Amino acid sequence: MTAAENVCYTLINVPMDSEPPSEISLKNDLEKGDVKSKTEALKKVIIMILNGEKLPGLLMTIIRFVLPLQDHTIKKLLLVFWEIVPKTTPDGRLLHEMILVCDAYRKDLQHPNEFIRGSTLRFLCKLKEAELLEPLMPAIRACLEHRHSYVRRNAVLAIYTIYRNFEHLIPDAPELIHDFLVNEKDASCKRNAFMMLIHADQDRALDYLSTCIDQVQTFGDILQLVIVELIYKVCHANPSERARFIRCIYNLLQSSSPAVKYEAAGTLVTLSSAPTAIKAAAQCYIDLIIKESDNNVKLIVLDRLVELKEHPAHERVLQDLVMDILRVLSTPDLEVRKKTLQLALDLVSSRNVEELVIVLKKEVIKTNNVSEHEDTDKYRQLLVRTLHSCSVRFPDMAANVIPVLMEFLSDSNEAAAADVLEFVREAIQRFDNLRMLIVEKMLEVFHAIKSVKIYRGALWILGEYCSTKEDIQSVMTEVRRSLGEIPIVESEIKKEAGELKPEEEITVGPVQKLVTEMGTYATQSALSSSRPTKKEEDRPPLRGFLLDGDFFVAASLATTLTKIALRYVALVQEKKKQNSFVAEAMLLMATILHLGKSSLPKKPITDDDVDRISLCLKVLSECSPLMNDIFNKECRQSLSQMLSAKLEEEKLSQKKESEKRNVTVQPDDPISFMQLTAKNEMNCKEDQFQLSLLAAMGNTQRKEAADPLASKLNKVTQLTGFSDPVYAEAYVHVNQYDIVLDVLVVNQTSDTLQNCTLELATLGDLKLVEKPSPLTLAPHDFANIKANVKVASTENGIIFGNIVYDVSGAASDRNCVVLSDIHIDIMDYIQPATCTDAEFRQMWAEFEWENKVTVNTNMTDLNDYLQHILKSTNMKCLTPEKALSGYCGFMAANLYARSIFGEDALANVSIEKPVHQGPDAAVTGHIRIRAKSQGMALSLGDKINLSQKKTSL
């Protein structure tokens, strides 16, 4: 191990504003100073030794003048000093002075103060010199019988460490600790003793557990956790022991400690696949989620349930617990609720879908009674989407869901109302038997709709699916009611003139007639020439939208009126009624056009809306069969095709997910029989405790490619040239939140290189954790240096630096070799993700940083270029494959990804292939990237530009 890899027990801040004290002044303070002076001097000595100073002349001074002191602060500092001070000569022999120190250790182990005894025992765990420990063994053994638990538990730790490092000093340690464990009452002492037996003598640990297996529930939680670990390790190594200990794990599921319950449930799942075991573990997880207040804990345990669901056999067991899982919805945290609803939706079946829908309906109603809050609105959206998915998967439920949800079309939260509208649109198209119900409920809430976007959607649905004469007449009535008195312009002018009359009689000056720009008369009061405003809330909804200048809804209304008028003509045979209805529809369109061209609206009507309304007027005036088919058949066919494509895509993604989860067994794969398996082959499964330990230490091993050239070797970066005196190359190992640089340094000269130091610096959101230690390289020798770099966000980072060294025996200045830059690839931190179209549009509007990248490539196929961008940026294409299929000379697609730091990245690809340049013309266009942070937008843009350069070569 290098110095940088050694375990560091002590970290002390070094003040940089003062000069380091001299050895003479320190010696004087240690010899003649008072307790306070000696304390300060000892602190300075410790800091200097940690900084690399030797100070051999002070060792005897400290032994003579500081070691005999009984001050507790000094005793604590001395333990640190003895830990770091060199205890051996250069040839490895123990210093003679350490014999005196050893005697001081022995006295402290027999000290009446339990803190001093315990601290000394903890210190002995760090000693690596057997000669120092040997005389202390009787005193250490005696500490096992001390009255205070602090001393006893540290004595156990000391014995365990000594036995592990120097077994010959205490060969009977397992037996000694086993006897101690049998008689011990303190929970922490028992835990340490049991932990030692697990690692030192597992058979004795199992013997002890067998004698008290029925009392495990009465033990403290720290001991229960160790027992769970032992059972897992034993059963992992020897599966035949499972039957012996599985009941103990079941009992520990009832522990009062949440940590024990969590570990016991995880162990139970790994030891048994029986439905009863899976159900017990899942029930334990659910109880933990409900009872624990920390949202992070809830999310972690929910992840365990999601992992259980991924196993096909376990999924069937979890389906019976859907209603229990829904109890988690009582948690106010949105992320927990989102994950819970997704899990419940994945597990729902025809057996429990009815109960699920009842619970979700109650939750929806609850959100209506809660005071408005951002999370409440988002939670309502989640509930609506979940009910939407349930209704699509289980059509029988749609009739129960629709009446409740349609109340929310009039909700002030447009996002929730839009989700309801999307659900209603799909339901009315898919389920013919529900069309009458949906139209009826839509007509009920139509007048209360507050959002113009929802109003447009409701108009479209009513126009498309009203099929009876009565429904058509009802739609026309609702439209007239929502539009108010017509003609709109004249009625508004009259209303304004009428509002000028005061409530009380006031003498009014002469009134003059004015001609407006539309050619109509308006009256002007002598009291005021400004137009007064009446409360806009009194206006009917549609009239209010039009006067606000939103004429897009007018174009939608014109289409709806045209559809229902054409349908009315087909249903009613009387010519008079036909003409009357068509004329009424045309009158409404004409009055809207008149309003749009007047000065009354806040914004004038656009040319597009004028064209649309004029087209509808022409269609109604001519009533051609072709237009009839387009309005009444083709529109619905387009919706049907879109919904079919969406459903097909969902089925395809579900199929891919199920294929991932299903383990395919080949016909010639060997079958493993547990009874016939050799012991050394039973450890094929990964040890979960070992994996979690590696993850905590940052040593998580990713699955590398089978070919080493395609995995590790392609991440080796050459830092210097082959002709440089020092050759260096680095393997860049990327973990989740940090980067480990494993640098190989080779001395290519015939000289000894002293103080060879790797000096690194970073650019971007990277931070060097520690400075690599200097080393000495013999001629043609090599060494590995490791450096850790922390990563805080998804930005392109650069690590640069140099190697400096001294040549042994040379009088010249320090030599320096400049290293090549190491560019950190942000693709290691970006993962493909998915979101709805509405969420994409919302984020697109909110994100302020945009990076526009111009397409510059030799590729000639639009689809190939899109796939190249997806591969280069690690993003997911949200645009359905059907929308991208075919060839029309241009393509537009939306891409989305999330970083492991929770940052969102959006991209819109807009590309085309110039037809006039022939079939070999290169793809042109641009890619717009949007992100919340500037770094993310720029980094993705750089990545795309870099990938384009490679394709252009």
Curated annotation (Swiss-Prot):
One of its GO terms (molecular function) is structural molecule activity. Its main location: cytoplasm. Keywords: Acetylation, Cell membrane, Cytoplasm, Cytoplasmic vesicle, ER-Golgi transport, Golgi apparatus, Membrane, Protein transport, Repeat, Transport. Predominantly expressed in the upper one-third of the oxyntic mucosa and in most regions of the pyloric mucosa. Ubiquitously expressed including platelet, liver, heart, spleen, lung and kidney. The modification N6-acetyllysine is found at residue 494. GO terms for cellular component: COPI vesicle coat; COPI-coated vesicle; cytosol; endoplasmic reticulum-Golgi intermediate compartment; Golgi apparatus; Golgi membrane; plasma membrane. HEAT repeats lie at residues 96-131, 132-168, 240-276, 277-314, 316-353, 396-433. The modification N-acetylthreonine is found at residue 2. It is found in: Cytoplasm; Golgi apparatus membrane; Cytoplasmic vesicle, COPI-coated vesicle membrane; Cell membrane. The coatomer is a cytosolic protein complex that binds to dilysine motifs and reversibly associates with Golgi non-clathrin-coated vesicles, which further mediate biosynthetic protein transport from the ER, via the Golgi up to the trans Golgi network. Coatomer complex is required for budding from Golgi membranes, and is essential for the retrograde Golgi-to-ER transport of dilysine-tagged proteins. Oligomeric complex that consists of at least the alpha, beta, beta', gamma, delta, epsilon and zeta subunits. Interacts with CAPN8. Interacts with SCYL1 and PRKCE. Interacts with COPG1. Interacts with ARF1 (myristoylated); this interaction is required for binding of COPB1 to Golgi membranes. Interacts (via trunk domain) with ARF1 (via switch I region); the interaction is direct. Interacts with KCNK2 (via N-terminus); this interaction increases the channel-mediated whole cell currents and promotes plasma membrane expression of KCNK2. Interacts with STX17. Interacts with TMEM115. This is Coatomer subunit beta. It comes from Mus musculus (Mouse). The lineage of its organism: Eukaryota, Metazoa, Chordata, Craniata, Vertebrata.
